[in-house]
Swiss-Prot record:
The keyword Transmembrane helix does not apply. GO terms for biological process: phosphoenolpyruvate-dependent sugar phosphotransferase system. Belongs to the HPr family. It is found in: Cytoplasm. It holds the Pfam family PTS-HPr. It comes from Neisseria meningitidis serogroup B (strain ATCC BAA-335 / MC58). Phosphorylation on Ser-46 inhibits the phosphoryl transfer from enzyme I to HPr. The lineage of its organism: Bacteria, Pseudomonadati, Pseudomonadota, Betaproteobacteria, Neisseriales. This is Phosphocarrier protein HPr. Transmembrane segments: none annotated. The modification Phosphoserine is found at residue 46. General (non sugar-specific) component of the phosphoenolpyruvate-dependent sugar phosphotransferase system (sugar PTS). This major carbohydrate active-transport system catalyzes the phosphorylation of incoming sugar substrates concomitantly with their translocation across the cell membrane. The phosphoryl group from phosphoenolpyruvate (PEP) is transferred to the phosphoryl carrier protein HPr by enzyme I. Phospho-HPr then transfers it to the PTS EIIA domain. Keywords: Cytoplasm, Phosphoprotein, Phosphotransferase system, Sugar transport, Transport. It comes from the Bacteria. The active site is at 15 (pros-phosphohistidine intermediate).
């Protein structure tokens, strides 16, 4: 199991389009993916769960991956977040 804290840096936070990109990326892997904000922990493959976190710009979330391809999943998800979900800012 891998855990990493990461800040949401894109302008609109974890909104619908960003949540969709996150869940699509997470779903490419066999590993379980969990996202935690404060005391709320949701399945990273659930768009509704992610949107319920209401993670705005500047929010620090904790990513957790667990499974055979956990390192690859963590790398892909952190790259997605650090790349502003492909939105440019």
């Amino acid at each position: 199991m891998l855990k990493q804290s990461i800040e949401i840096i894109n302008k609109l936070g974890l909104h619908a389009r960003a949540s969709n990109k996150f869940t699509q990326t997470a779903s490419q892997f066999k590993s379980e993916v969990w996202v935690t904000k404060n005391d709320s922990r949701v399945n990273g493959k659930s768009i509704m769960g992610l949107m319920m976190l209401a993670a705005a710009k500047g929010t620090v979330i904790e990513l957790e991956t667990d499974g055979a391809d956990e390192a690859e999943a963590m790398r892909a998800l952190t790259d997605l977040i650090n790349g502003y979900f492909g939105e440019g800012e």
